[in-house]
Regions:
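Conserved class I S-adenosyl-L-methionine
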Residues: 172-181
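Non-catalytic substrate-recognition/targeting regions of SAM-dependent transferases
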Residues: 56-69, 85-156
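S-adenosyl-L-methionine
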Residues: 205-246
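Non-catalytic accessory regions of SAM-dependent methyltransferases
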Residues: 1-72
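Mobile active-site "lid"/loop adjacent to the S-adenosyl-L-methionine
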Residues: 242-272
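Conserved SAM-binding loop of SAM-dependent methyltransferases across substrates and taxa
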Residues: 182-195
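Conserved SAM-binding motif I beta-strand of class I
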Residues: 196-201
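C-terminal catalytic and target-recognition region of SAM-dependent MTase-like enzymes
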Residues: 282-345
Length: 345
């Protein structure tokens, strides 16, 4: 009995990457339809003056293992499955025809490639080399992007809507941006009138980029402070009180066997953050660990609130924006999860 059409890879735990349930050829016309559909979705959903966004989100756009991000006039691509890798030259050609970028940079790296039997690959695949800093616009702010050396493809595009939400609630507030990377949450908050923004990250390079972004948005130095520190230690040692805290850590759970240790980490940072919030204070807490489902993440924050002896309300569950669609049949694509919490009076 025929089920569908996809690519088979005997070397990987995911042996089949299904492309269609229909009896149709996987040819140029098929791939073009999928790419054009993804592009049309972004054109319809993206806020105006947004020049950094995800154009193709793998399984979420029914193109397994394929990621394309737009940063101004440049594209960054990832071919994270053998099925996507087979289509590389065809997909790049179509991207050029559709968007006319100045250059396309491939950044196909990580353990997923290894499992698929592929080597890590990084470098220009079409056109010009991206400059060391690319400027994009988002939420009325400018951000410098480091494609070659930055985290992920250069920026955490999946947090755009959540940055806008935090910014809208930050006027006159004292905000702590934990695991700040290039400062996104804090910069949007400062643009919206935050009274004070403290950005904490363990990476000197990330904080240097955050300072560049701060200056690039003409924000006053008297409002912002950038601190290089381990976030766990900072939360335990600081005596400063904040009105809004954002926790957007790297994944504490990269493998299933890391779940127990990772849950302890999430509980600890949320517990310590809740200690620093006054009644009415807001906590935006995120996890990008694929192996931690939302129900377990919420339970972890519940235990943190109990140990901190704080009464806490859930105001909203948080997810990526519409440029990161999730295939209903691919729950693993729902990696980023967050919760907006309020400390009770």
């Amino acid at each position: 009995m025929r089920i569908g059409t996809g690519y088979f890879n005997s070397r990987c735990s995911i042996t089949v990457r299904l492309l269609t349930w229909q009896d149709e050829a996987i040819d140029v016309r098929f791939i073009r339809r999928r790419i054009e559909s993804a592009f049309a979705l972004r054109q319809a959903m993206l806020p105006p003056r947004t020049t950094g966004y995800r154009l193709i989100n793998g399984e979420g756009d029914f193109l397994p293992g394929l990621v394309f991000d737009v940063y101004g006039d440049f594209l960054v691509c990832q071919f994270m499955a053998a099925a996507a890798n087979i289509l590389k030259s065809l997909v790049i050609e179509m991207r050029v025809a559709l968007l006319s970028p100045q250059g396309i940079y491939e950044k196909s790296e990580g353990s997923v490639r290894h499992e698929e039997g592929l080597l890590n690959t990084a470098g220009v695949v079409w056109g010009q080399e991206p400059p060391s800093l690319i400027t994009i616009e988002e939420n009325g702010c400018r951000f410098f992007i480091q494609v070659q050396s930055g985290q992920k493809t250069g920026f955490f595009l999946d947090q755009r809507n959540n940055r806008a939400l935090v910014g809208s609630l930050s006027r006159g507030k004292r905000l702590l941006n934990g695991f700040s990377y290039s400062g996104g949450f804090g910069i949007v908050a400062a643009k919206q009138g935050a009274q004070r923004v403290v950005s904490v990250d363990s990476s000197a390079a990330a904080l240097h980029l955050a300072r560049q972004n701060w200056q690039g948005n003409d924000l006053p130095d008297t409002v912002g402070e950038h601190i290089q520190a381990d976030m766990f230690s900072y939360l335990r040692e600081t005596t400063e009180v904040f009105d809004v805290i954002v926790l957007d850590p790297p994944p504490f759970i990269r493998r299933r066997q890391d779940v127990r240790a990772g849950v302890k980490g999430y509980k600890e940072i949320n517990l310590q953050a809740l200690r620093l919030l006054p009644p009415g204070g807001l906590l935006f807490s995120f996890s990008c660990s694929q192996h931690l489902p939302m129900r377990d993440f919420l339970q972890t924050t519940l235990f943190a609130a109990a140990d901190a002896r704080r009464r806490v309300q859930i105001l909203q569950h948080l997810e990526p924006g519409a440029d990161h669609p999730i295939n209903l049949a691919h729950g693993e694509g729902s990696y980023l999860k967050g919760v907006w919490l309020r400390v009770g009076d």
